[in-house]
Amino acid sequence: MDLFEYQAKELFAKHNVPSTPGRVTDTAEGAKAIATEIGRPVMVKAQVKIGGRGKAGGVKYAATPQDAYEHAKNILGLDIKGHIVKKLLVAEASDIAEEYYLSFLLDRANRTYLAMCSVEGGMEIEEVAATKPERLAKVPVNAVKGVDLDFARSIAEQGHLPAEVLDTAAVTIAKLWELFVAEDATLVEVNPLVRTPDHKILALDAKITLDGNADFRQPGHAEFEDRAATDPLELKAKEHDLNYVKLDGQVGIIGNGAGLAMSTLDVVAYAGEKHGGVKPANFLDIGGGASAEVMAAGLDVVLGDQQVKSVFVNVFGGITSCDAVATGIVKALGMLGDEANKPLVVRLDGNNVEEGRRILTEANHPLVTLVATMDEAADKAAELASA
């Protein structure tokens, strides 16, 4: 579960990670009241679970409470990459001497944890990794030993933080590790981690992802779930017991099985590079069954995304045979009627594949293109999305 910034900062306070005081509100009047209470210039920050807030006008400096009110009026209701701003964090503005970057995350490839630290904070970390890789330290963390002050200082030193802040930064880094472990997080990211003119270290921004598999031992995390702010397509998918995650691309993905769906994301992203940077629009696993009702629900969710230009249905027939899947696709298109208005690229393989292909061929639906291999299907879906 991804947290809003204000929720992440609640965990900062719980674990004594230094940050700036502030409160959340959903009205312009509330923003003015909080700014008045703080009594200093503030930052008015849109609360959305996506990057790029600043470039979209979702983060503003307010010198006075009236400025906070005016900014809040403009930010509330703002559409940031499909996310509508419904809440604001109003936090005390901080004097900044330098900006750094710090994160803890799972290193799945090496089956361990990873600390990342850089003196180049305040910008997209992907940009730092691409343009100044020598300025980004990637430090493996032993899960048993963890991060004590000495190791935290080493992380800061490898990230090229100035010598005069190493000890202070180490304290904050150790506290962030404590949070990471205690809260069963898969990501704790601070960008920027700043040094003030008086050499204090503050975590000004916060991005935290919590591991839903640990909910059974983290009952307090339930309060962080915000159904009103959850993507409506994700809510619709949840109602049908479908595993759906919205992304920012143009090719809708439907796969039966999480592994196949993940592989489909990869091949579409690769194929999309040849077609103007087309990307996957979602992850959707319809599970082992692909009945007409399940397929219709999946298509309904995927086609509800206005960014989707084509759909790639990638199914491997196992217990559910390919002929049953093909029948489900044909029936689903009939059930959806005019709502099924984007081209579908279908790739079938596995149990009874020839019969499945025959059913789709004879149906001769104008929206359906039947393709033999996954690579060809990904290329076709990306081509259609770029047209």
From Swiss-Prot:
One of its GO terms (biological process) is tricarboxylic acid cycle. SUPFAM superfamilies: Glutathione synthetase ATP-binding domain-like, Succinyl-CoA synthetase domains. InterPro entries: ATP-grasp, ATP-grasp_succ-CoA_synth-type, ATP_grasp_subdomain_1, Succ-CoA_synthase_bsu_CS, SUCC_ACL_C, Succ_CoA_ligase-like_bsu, Succinyl-CoA_synth-like. Coiled coil: none annotated. Substrate binds at residues 256, 318-320. The keyword Transferase does not apply. Its EC number is 6.2.1.5. Binds 1 Mg(2+) ion per subunit. The keyword Ligase applies. It is an enzyme of class 6 (ligase). Keywords: ATP-binding, Ligase, Magnesium, Metal-binding, Nucleotide-binding, Tricarboxylic acid cycle. GO terms for molecular function: ATP binding; magnesium ion binding; succinate-CoA ligase (ADP-forming) activity; succinate-CoA ligase (GDP-forming) activity. ATP binds at residues 45, 52-54, 94, 99. Residues 9-236 form the ATP-grasp domain. Pathway: Carbohydrate metabolism; tricarboxylic acid cycle; succinate from succinyl-CoA (ligase route): step 1/1. Its cofactor is Mg(2+). One of its GO terms (cellular component) is cytosol. Gene3D superfamilies: ATP-grasp fold, A domain (3.30.1490.20), ATP-grasp fold, B domain (3.30.470.20), Succinyl-CoA synthetase domains (3.40.50.261). Mg(2+) binds at residues 191, 205. It catalyses: succinate + ATP + CoA = succinyl-CoA + ADP + phosphate; GTP + succinate + CoA = succinyl-CoA + GDP + phosphate. Belongs to the succinate/malate CoA ligase beta subunit family. Heterotetramer of two alpha and two beta subunits. Succinyl-CoA synthetase functions in the citric acid cycle (TCA), coupling the hydrolysis of succinyl-CoA to the synthesis of either ATP or GTP and thus represents the only step of substrate-level phosphorylation in the TCA. The beta subunit provides nucleotide specificity of the enzyme and binds the substrate succinate, while the binding sites for coenzyme A and phosphate are found in the alpha subunit. This is Succinate--CoA ligase [ADP-forming] subunit beta. It comes from Mycobacterium bovis (strain ATCC BAA-935 / AF2122/97).
